[in-house]
Amino acid sequence: MNATAGLPVVGVDLAKSVFQLAVADGAWRIVEQHRLTRTQLERWFANRAVGLVVMEACGSAHHWARWLNGLGIEVRLLPAAYVRVYVKRNKTDAADAGALLEAARLALTSRQCG
């Protein structure tokens, strides 16, 4: 399954006021990282073509998933326990966003996700 169709995949670490994004290319290499406020996040997604967004399932994840679906972006929510094992460094927002991409890559290639 090619969920990205040549478009970037974005891992989003959700937080109360600042969000960390890791953007991967079609080969799942992280090519960009961003730290955005809520307003900046909304503007960023509204102005970008994105193939897939992966987020850790949490309280606000469903709100953001619905909003992103409204923009025509496919969203996958991953259980926190599944993502946690892919954090390779100290736990930071940037590491979490990268771990989301790694977890999604492995889940999509083994068909465990969605």
Where in the sequence are the language-model features?
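Phosphate- and other anionic-substrate recognition elements at nucleic-acid/protein interfaces
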Residues: M1-G114
